[in-house]
Protein backbone atom coordinates (compact mmCIF):
# COMPACT_ATOMS: atom_id res chain seq x y z
CA UNK A 1 0.00 0.00 0.00
CA UNK A 2 1.41 3.39 -0.92
CA UNK A 3 2.11 5.95 1.78
CA UNK A 4 -0.71 8.23 0.71
CA UNK A 5 -3.12 5.29 0.69
CA UNK A 6 -2.65 4.43 4.37
CA UNK A 7 -5.26 6.89 5.54
CA UNK A 8 -8.25 8.38 3.83
CA UNK A 9 -8.86 12.01 4.70
CA UNK A 10 -12.44 13.01 5.38
CA UNK A 11 -12.74 16.76 5.77
CA UNK A 12 -16.28 16.71 7.08
CA UNK A 13 -15.66 14.66 10.19
CA UNK A 14 -12.12 15.95 10.60
CA UNK A 15 -10.21 12.79 11.23
CA UNK A 16 -8.41 10.01 9.43
CA UNK A 17 -10.19 6.85 8.43
CA UNK A 18 -8.15 3.68 8.37
CA UNK A 19 -8.33 1.94 5.00
CA UNK A 20 -7.30 -1.32 6.62
CA UNK A 21 -7.32 -1.86 10.36
CA UNK A 22 -5.18 -4.99 10.34
CA UNK A 23 -1.49 -4.30 10.75
CA UNK A 24 -0.72 -7.46 8.77
CA UNK A 25 -2.34 -6.20 5.58
CA UNK A 26 0.40 -3.72 4.79
CA UNK A 27 3.76 -2.47 5.85
CA UNK A 28 2.63 0.77 7.46
CA UNK A 29 5.32 3.32 8.29
CA UNK A 30 3.89 3.99 11.75
CA UNK A 31 4.62 2.85 15.27
CA UNK A 32 3.38 -0.71 15.93
CA UNK A 33 1.76 0.39 19.18
CA UNK A 34 -0.56 2.72 17.29
CA UNK A 35 -1.23 0.43 14.35
CA UNK A 36 -2.31 -2.43 16.61
CA UNK A 37 -6.08 -3.08 16.25
CA UNK A 38 -6.50 -3.01 20.04
CA UNK A 39 -5.58 0.67 20.09
CA UNK A 40 -8.29 1.39 17.54
CA UNK A 41 -10.85 -0.31 19.78
CA UNK A 42 -9.95 2.07 22.60
CA UNK A 43 -11.12 5.06 20.55
CA UNK A 44 -14.73 3.80 20.11
CA UNK A 45 -14.72 2.92 23.81
CA UNK A 46 -13.92 6.56 24.62
CA UNK A 47 -16.76 7.58 22.31
CA UNK A 48 -19.02 5.21 24.24
CA UNK A 49 -18.12 6.84 27.55
CA UNK A 50 -18.79 10.31 26.12
CA UNK A 51 -22.15 9.19 24.72
CA UNK A 52 -23.21 7.53 27.99
CA UNK A 53 -22.26 10.51 30.16
CA UNK A 54 -23.86 12.93 27.72
CA UNK A 55 -27.11 10.96 27.57
CA UNK A 56 -27.41 10.86 31.36
CA UNK A 57 -26.66 14.56 31.80
CA UNK A 58 -28.72 16.00 28.96
CA UNK A 59 -31.75 13.72 29.42
CA UNK A 60 -31.80 14.58 33.12
CA UNK A 61 -31.59 18.29 32.34
CA UNK A 62 -34.45 18.13 29.84
CA UNK A 63 -36.52 16.02 32.23
CA UNK A 64 -36.06 18.59 34.99
CA UNK A 65 -37.29 21.34 32.70
CA UNK A 66 -40.31 19.30 31.55
CA UNK A 67 -41.39 17.93 34.94
CA UNK A 68 -40.48 20.69 37.42
CA UNK A 69 -42.77 23.60 36.68
CA UNK A 70 -40.87 26.04 38.87
CA UNK A 71 -37.74 25.52 36.74
CA UNK A 72 -39.43 26.68 33.54
CA UNK A 73 -37.93 30.14 33.21
CA UNK A 74 -36.21 31.95 30.37
CA UNK A 75 -32.58 30.88 30.92
CA UNK A 76 -33.57 27.28 31.60
CA UNK A 77 -35.56 27.09 28.37
CA UNK A 78 -32.52 28.13 26.36
CA UNK A 79 -30.35 25.68 28.27
CA UNK A 80 -32.87 22.89 27.62
CA UNK A 81 -32.77 23.69 23.90
CA UNK A 82 -28.98 23.53 24.11
CA UNK A 83 -29.23 20.12 25.79
CA UNK A 84 -31.60 18.88 23.08
CA UNK A 85 -29.11 19.84 20.38
CA UNK A 86 -26.31 18.09 22.26
CA UNK A 87 -28.49 15.02 22.70
CA UNK A 88 -29.19 14.88 18.97
CA UNK A 89 -25.47 15.02 18.21
CA UNK A 90 -24.63 12.28 20.72
CA UNK A 91 -27.35 9.91 19.49
CA UNK A 92 -26.67 10.25 15.77
CA UNK A 93 -23.21 11.61 14.92
CA UNK A 94 -21.06 10.24 17.74
CA UNK A 95 -21.85 6.54 17.04
CA UNK A 96 -21.20 7.10 13.33
CA UNK A 97 -17.85 8.69 14.14
CA UNK A 98 -16.94 5.78 16.40
CA UNK A 99 -17.85 3.22 13.72
CA UNK A 100 -15.14 4.57 11.42
CA UNK A 101 -12.48 3.05 13.67
CA UNK A 102 -14.14 -0.38 13.60
CA UNK A 103 -14.93 -0.64 9.88
CA UNK A 104 -12.96 0.13 6.76
CA UNK A 105 -15.90 1.49 4.79
CA UNK A 106 -18.92 3.75 5.14
CA UNK A 107 -21.76 1.73 6.68
CA UNK A 108 -24.74 4.06 6.45
CA UNK A 109 -25.46 4.44 2.74
CA UNK A 110 -26.05 7.54 0.67
CA UNK A 111 -28.92 8.76 2.85
CA UNK A 112 -26.76 8.52 5.95
CA UNK A 113 -23.95 10.31 4.15
CA UNK A 114 -26.23 13.28 3.57
CA UNK A 115 -28.15 13.14 6.84
CA UNK A 116 -25.30 12.80 9.36
CA UNK A 117 -23.38 15.95 8.29
CA UNK A 118 -26.68 17.85 8.23
CA UNK A 119 -27.51 16.80 11.80
CA UNK A 120 -24.00 17.56 12.98
CA UNK A 121 -23.93 21.11 11.66
CA UNK A 122 -27.49 21.71 12.88
CA UNK A 123 -26.44 20.72 16.39
CA UNK A 124 -23.37 22.96 16.28
CA UNK A 125 -25.52 25.84 15.07
CA UNK A 126 -28.09 25.29 17.82
CA UNK A 127 -25.30 25.28 20.41
CA UNK A 128 -23.49 28.44 19.40
CA UNK A 129 -26.60 30.44 18.47
CA UNK A 130 -28.33 29.45 21.72
CA UNK A 131 -25.27 30.59 23.67
CA UNK A 132 -25.48 33.89 21.80
CA UNK A 133 -29.17 34.21 22.68
CA UNK A 134 -28.41 33.39 26.33
CA UNK A 135 -25.76 36.10 26.40
CA UNK A 136 -28.23 38.56 24.89
CA UNK A 137 -30.78 37.56 27.54
CA UNK A 138 -28.24 38.18 30.32
CA UNK A 139 -27.32 41.51 28.73
CA UNK A 140 -30.96 42.58 28.73
CA UNK A 141 -31.55 41.43 32.33
CA UNK A 142 -28.46 43.18 33.70
CA UNK A 143 -27.81 46.20 31.47
CA UNK A 144 -31.34 46.99 30.21
CA UNK A 145 -33.74 45.60 32.86
CA UNK A 146 -36.41 48.18 31.99
CA UNK A 147 -36.84 46.53 28.58
CA UNK A 148 -37.97 43.20 30.06
CA UNK A 149 -41.53 42.31 29.07
CA UNK A 150 -43.15 40.11 31.71
CA UNK A 151 -46.24 39.19 29.71
CA UNK A 152 -45.89 36.12 27.50
CA UNK A 153 -42.12 36.13 28.07
CA UNK A 154 -41.81 32.35 28.09
CA UNK A 155 -43.79 32.03 24.86
CA UNK A 156 -41.55 34.59 23.16
CA UNK A 157 -38.46 32.68 24.26
CA UNK A 158 -39.99 29.45 22.90
CA UNK A 159 -40.40 31.16 19.53
CA UNK A 160 -36.80 32.40 19.67
CA UNK A 161 -35.56 28.89 20.45
CA UNK A 162 -37.60 27.49 17.56
CA UNK A 163 -36.20 30.19 15.28
CA UNK A 164 -32.65 29.19 16.27
CA UNK A 165 -33.39 25.58 15.28
CA UNK A 166 -34.86 26.66 11.93
CA UNK A 167 -31.89 28.91 11.12
CA UNK A 168 -29.44 26.17 12.09
CA UNK A 169 -31.19 23.65 9.84
CA UNK A 170 -31.27 26.09 6.92
CA UNK A 171 -27.54 26.76 7.27
CA UNK A 172 -26.91 23.00 7.34
CA UNK A 173 -28.80 22.28 4.10
CA UNK A 174 -25.66 22.68 1.92
CA UNK A 175 -24.08 19.84 3.91
CA UNK A 176 -26.86 17.50 2.81
CA UNK A 177 -26.72 18.75 -0.77
CA UNK A 178 -22.98 18.41 -1.37
CA UNK A 179 -22.12 15.40 0.81
CA UNK A 180 -21.99 12.17 -1.16
CA UNK A 181 -20.36 8.76 -1.33
CA UNK A 182 -16.88 8.62 -2.80
CA UNK A 183 -15.20 5.41 -4.06
CA UNK A 184 -11.58 4.90 -3.09
CA UNK A 185 -9.67 2.24 -5.02
CA UNK A 186 -6.65 0.51 -3.49
CA UNK A 187 -4.46 -0.76 -6.31
CA UNK A 188 -2.29 -3.10 -4.21
CA UNK A 189 -5.26 -5.26 -3.16
CA UNK A 190 -7.60 -4.31 -6.03
CA UNK A 191 -10.28 -3.36 -3.50
CA UNK A 192 -12.65 -0.41 -3.57
CA UNK A 193 -13.64 1.34 -0.35
CA UNK A 194 -16.58 3.71 -0.04
CA UNK A 195 -16.23 6.87 2.04
CA UNK A 196 -18.53 9.80 2.76
CA UNK A 197 -17.10 13.17 1.73
CA UNK A 198 -18.68 16.65 1.86
CA UNK A 199 -17.55 17.60 -1.66
CA UNK A 200 -16.16 14.55 -3.48
CA UNK A 201 -16.36 16.04 -6.98
CA UNK A 202 -15.22 19.61 -6.35
CA UNK A 203 -11.93 21.42 -6.81
CA UNK A 204 -9.62 22.73 -4.10
CA UNK A 205 -11.45 26.05 -3.79
CA UNK A 206 -14.63 24.51 -2.39
CA UNK A 207 -13.07 23.09 0.82
CA UNK A 208 -11.30 26.40 1.47
CA UNK A 209 -14.57 28.33 1.20
CA UNK A 210 -16.44 25.71 3.21
CA UNK A 211 -13.95 25.59 6.09
CA UNK A 212 -13.57 29.37 6.33
CA UNK A 213 -17.34 29.96 6.16
CA UNK A 214 -17.94 27.35 8.88
CA UNK A 215 -15.24 28.88 11.07
CA UNK A 216 -16.71 32.38 10.72
CA UNK A 217 -20.43 31.56 10.93
CA UNK A 218 -20.29 28.90 13.64
CA UNK A 219 -17.38 30.18 15.72
CA UNK A 220 -15.80 33.59 15.18
CA UNK A 221 -18.88 35.77 14.60
CA UNK A 222 -21.07 34.33 17.41
CA UNK A 223 -18.21 34.40 19.92
CA UNK A 224 -17.39 37.98 18.92
CA UNK A 225 -21.01 39.01 19.55
CA UNK A 226 -20.95 37.20 22.90
CA UNK A 227 -17.73 39.02 23.82
CA UNK A 228 -19.39 42.38 23.15
CA UNK A 229 -22.38 41.43 25.32
CA UNK A 230 -20.14 40.36 28.17
CA UNK A 231 -18.06 43.51 27.94
CA UNK A 232 -21.16 45.60 28.65
CA UNK A 233 -22.35 43.13 31.31
CA UNK A 234 -19.03 43.36 33.16
CA UNK A 235 -18.98 47.13 32.82
CA UNK A 236 -22.51 47.44 34.23
CA UNK A 237 -21.84 45.09 37.15
CA UNK A 238 -18.72 47.03 38.11
CA UNK A 239 -20.64 50.32 37.99
CA UNK A 240 -23.51 48.83 40.01
CA UNK A 241 -21.09 47.72 42.73
CA UNK A 242 -19.98 51.35 43.22
CA UNK A 243 -23.40 52.99 42.82
CA UNK A 244 -25.56 51.03 45.26
CA UNK A 245 -28.30 53.21 46.84
CA UNK A 246 -28.48 53.47 50.61
CA UNK A 247 -32.05 52.14 50.85
CA UNK A 248 -32.66 48.61 49.69
CA UNK A 249 -28.94 47.99 49.65
CA UNK A 250 -29.20 44.36 50.79
CA UNK A 251 -31.86 43.47 48.25
CA UNK A 252 -29.97 45.07 45.37
CA UNK A 253 -26.78 43.30 46.38
CA UNK A 254 -28.60 39.98 46.39
CA UNK A 255 -30.05 40.62 42.97
CA UNK A 256 -26.71 41.69 41.54
CA UNK A 257 -25.10 38.56 42.97
CA UNK A 258 -27.91 36.48 41.47
CA UNK A 259 -27.37 37.92 38.03
CA UNK A 260 -23.61 37.63 38.32
CA UNK A 261 -23.97 33.92 39.06
CA UNK A 262 -26.17 33.28 36.04
CA UNK A 263 -23.95 35.41 33.81
CA UNK A 264 -21.00 33.39 35.09
CA UNK A 265 -22.80 30.13 34.24
CA UNK A 266 -23.49 31.25 30.67
CA UNK A 267 -19.88 32.44 30.34
CA UNK A 268 -18.64 29.01 31.44
CA UNK A 269 -20.82 27.39 28.75
CA UNK A 270 -19.35 29.76 26.16
CA UNK A 271 -15.82 29.06 27.34
CA UNK A 272 -16.35 25.31 27.14
CA UNK A 273 -17.74 25.60 23.62
CA UNK A 274 -14.84 27.79 22.46
CA UNK A 275 -12.26 25.48 24.02
CA UNK A 276 -13.78 22.23 22.75
CA UNK A 277 -14.44 23.30 19.16
CA UNK A 278 -11.37 25.45 18.39
CA UNK A 279 -8.98 22.52 17.70
CA UNK A 280 -11.54 20.95 15.35
CA UNK A 281 -11.89 24.17 13.36
CA UNK A 282 -8.12 24.70 13.22
CA UNK A 283 -7.47 21.19 11.88
CA UNK A 284 -10.30 21.54 9.37
CA UNK A 285 -8.79 24.80 8.09
CA UNK A 286 -5.35 23.21 7.90
CA UNK A 287 -6.64 20.27 5.87
CA UNK A 288 -8.74 22.44 3.58
CA UNK A 289 -5.74 24.57 2.63
CA UNK A 290 -3.66 21.42 2.09
CA UNK A 291 -6.42 19.54 0.27
CA UNK A 292 -4.16 17.89 -2.30
CA UNK A 293 -1.83 16.54 0.39
CA UNK A 294 -2.41 13.77 2.93
CA UNK A 295 -0.54 14.24 6.19
CA UNK A 296 0.18 10.68 7.37
CA UNK A 297 2.28 11.70 10.37
CA UNK A 298 1.34 10.13 13.68
CA UNK A 299 1.21 13.57 15.31
CA UNK A 300 -1.48 14.71 12.89
CA UNK A 301 -3.40 11.46 13.31
CA UNK A 302 -3.43 11.68 17.12
CA UNK A 303 -4.18 15.41 17.08
CA UNK A 304 -7.14 14.82 14.75
CA UNK A 305 -8.59 12.14 17.01
CA UNK A 306 -8.16 14.27 20.14
CA UNK A 307 -9.75 17.29 18.45
CA UNK A 308 -12.72 15.21 17.34
CA UNK A 309 -13.21 13.65 20.78
CA UNK A 310 -12.92 17.08 22.39
CA UNK A 311 -15.64 18.45 20.10
CA UNK A 312 -18.03 15.66 21.11
CA UNK A 313 -17.08 16.13 24.76
CA UNK A 314 -18.64 19.58 24.58
CA UNK A 315 -22.02 17.87 24.18
CA UNK A 316 -21.75 16.17 27.56
CA UNK A 317 -20.05 18.72 29.84
CA UNK A 318 -22.73 21.44 30.11
CA UNK A 319 -25.08 19.56 32.49
CA UNK A 320 -22.20 18.81 34.83
CA UNK A 321 -20.89 22.37 34.69
CA UNK A 322 -24.42 23.43 35.61
CA UNK A 323 -24.40 20.88 38.43
CA UNK A 324 -21.29 22.51 39.90
CA UNK A 325 -22.43 26.11 39.43
CA UNK A 326 -26.13 25.99 40.36
CA UNK A 327 -27.38 24.83 43.75
CA UNK A 328 -30.98 24.60 42.56
CA UNK A 329 -30.11 22.47 39.54
CA UNK A 330 -27.84 20.33 41.70
CA UNK A 331 -30.76 19.69 44.04
CA UNK A 332 -33.06 18.76 41.15
CA UNK A 333 -30.35 16.64 39.53
CA UNK A 334 -29.89 14.68 42.76
CA UNK A 335 -33.65 14.31 43.04
CA UNK A 336 -33.92 12.80 39.56
CA UNK A 337 -30.96 10.44 39.89
CA UNK A 338 -31.17 9.50 43.56
CA UNK A 339 -34.97 9.52 43.84
CA UNK A 340 -34.89 11.71 46.91
CA UNK A 341 -37.44 14.31 47.86
CA UNK A 342 -36.59 17.88 46.92
CA UNK A 343 -36.23 20.35 49.76
CA UNK A 344 -38.75 23.04 50.49
CA UNK A 345 -38.35 26.37 48.81
CA UNK A 346 -37.97 29.06 51.44
CA UNK A 347 -39.26 32.54 50.75
CA UNK A 348 -38.66 35.52 52.99
CA UNK A 349 -41.70 37.52 54.03
CA UNK A 350 -41.83 40.98 55.54
CA UNK A 351 -44.71 43.16 56.68
CA UNK A 352 -46.95 44.07 53.77
CA UNK A 353 -44.78 42.56 51.08
CA UNK A 354 -43.27 39.33 49.84
CA UNK A 355 -39.93 39.18 48.09
CA UNK A 356 -38.56 36.29 46.11
CA UNK A 357 -34.81 36.43 45.56
CA UNK A 358 -34.09 34.63 42.32
CA UNK A 359 -30.66 33.12 42.06
CA UNK A 360 -28.82 31.45 39.23
CA UNK A 361 -31.29 29.07 37.59
CA UNK A 362 -33.17 28.96 40.89
CA UNK A 363 -36.78 27.77 41.05
CA UNK A 364 -39.05 30.75 40.58
CA UNK A 365 -42.77 31.31 40.57
CA UNK A 366 -43.79 33.15 37.39
CA UNK A 367 -46.72 34.76 39.20
CA UNK A 368 -44.43 36.58 41.63
CA UNK A 369 -42.94 39.82 40.36
CA UNK A 370 -39.63 41.22 41.54
CA UNK A 371 -39.01 44.93 42.06
CA UNK A 372 -35.42 46.02 41.78
CA UNK A 373 -33.46 49.23 42.16
CA UNK A 374 -30.60 49.17 39.68
CA UNK A 375 -28.49 52.31 39.21
CA UNK A 376 -31.24 54.39 40.78
CA UNK A 377 -34.00 53.07 38.48
CA UNK A 378 -36.94 51.04 39.73
CA UNK A 379 -37.64 48.18 37.39
CA UNK A 380 -40.25 45.46 37.29
CA UNK A 381 -39.34 42.09 35.92
CA UNK A 382 -40.62 38.57 36.15
CA UNK A 383 -37.74 36.62 34.69
CA UNK A 384 -34.08 37.00 35.56
Curated annotation (Swiss-Prot):
The protein in question is named Gastrin-releasing peptide receptor
| Sequence ranges on the Cytoplasmic membrane side | 63-76, 137-152, 235-264, 326-384
Query: Does Acyltransferase show up as a keyword for this record?
Result: no
A Gene Ontology biological process annotation? response to external biotic stimulus
Q: Which CDD domains match?
A: 7tmA_GRPR (cd15124)
**One MF term in GO for this entry?**
neuropeptide receptor activity
Per the record's keyword annotation, is Disulfide bond included, yes or no? yes
Keyword entries, A-Z: Cell membrane, Disulfide bond, G-protein coupled receptor, Glycoprotein, Lipoprotein, Membrane, Palmitate, Phosphoprotein, Receptor, Transducer, Transmembrane, Transmembrane helix
Q: Which Pfam families match?
A: 7tm_1
Q: Which residues carry this modification: Phosphoserine?
A: 350
| Lipid attachment in record (S-palmitoyl cysteine) | 339
- Which residues carry a glycan? 20
**Task performed by this protein:** Receptor for gastrin-releasing peptide (GRP). Signals via association with G proteins that activate a phosphatidylinositol-calcium second messenger system, resulting in Akt phosphorylation. Contributes to the regulation of food intake. Contributes to the perception of prurient stimuli and transmission of itch signals in the spinal cord that promote scratching behavior, but does not play a role in the perception of pain. Contributes primarily to nonhistaminergic itch sensation.
Listed as disulfide-bonded, the cysteine pairs are 113-196
Q: Where in the cell is it found?
A: Cell membrane
List the transmembrane segments: 39-62, 77-96, 115-136, 153-174, 209-234, 265-285, 299-325
The main location is: membrane
Amino acid sequence: MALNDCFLLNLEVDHFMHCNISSHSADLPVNDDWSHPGILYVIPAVYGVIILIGLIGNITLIKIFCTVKSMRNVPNLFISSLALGDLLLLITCAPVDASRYLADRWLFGRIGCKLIPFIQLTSVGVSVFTLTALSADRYKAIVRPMDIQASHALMKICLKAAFIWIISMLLAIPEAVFSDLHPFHEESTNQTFISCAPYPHSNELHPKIHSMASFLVFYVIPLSIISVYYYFIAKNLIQSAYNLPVEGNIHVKKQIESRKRLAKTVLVFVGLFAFCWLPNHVIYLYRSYHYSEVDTSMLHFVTSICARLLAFTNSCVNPFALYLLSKSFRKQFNTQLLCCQPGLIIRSHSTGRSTTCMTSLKSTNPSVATFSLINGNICHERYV
